Amino acid sequence: QWLSFLGEAYEGAKDMWRAYSDMREANFKGADKYFHARGNYDAAQRGPGGVWAAEVISNGREALQGITDPLFKGMTRDQVREDTKADQFANEWGRSGKDPNHFRPPGLPDKY
């Protein structure tokens, strides 16, 4: 059972990385919430280990962005807080098994 959990976590982490890589490649305005939801959704489909990996990675990413966004994007604390809230909503949406296409922006290439 523990080995299964670790395998799910590993595969879930790969799902999260794939969504992040696709987001960077697409470079499509307004698509970040879709990729957040999709990565979490795909990881969660792996099982409890995937859910765990998605949550740890999502929370870590948001904590890091709380530091880097004000420095590199010039965002205020309020802007960071709102963006984090929206990102976490999309993360939880996907992790709970809801369709990530809810956040898909019009015009995003079908490849994603």
Swiss-Prot record:
Induction: Upon cytokine stimulation. The modification Pyrrolidone carboxylic acid is found at residue 1. Residues 75-112 are annotated as: Disordered. Its main location: secreted. Residues 75-86 have a biased composition (Basic and acidic residues). It is found in: Secreted. GO terms for cellular component: high-density lipoprotein particle. Keywords: Acute phase, Amyloid, HDL, Pyrrolidone carboxylic acid, Secreted. It holds the Pfam family SAA. Expressed by the liver; secreted in plasma. GO terms for biological process: acute-phase response. Disulfide bonds: none annotated. It comes from the Eukaryota. Belongs to the SAA family. It is linked to Reactive, secondary amyloidosis is characterized by the extracellular accumulation in various tissues of the SAA protein. These deposits are highly insoluble and resistant to proteolysis; they disrupt tissue structure and compromise function. This is Serum amyloid A protein.
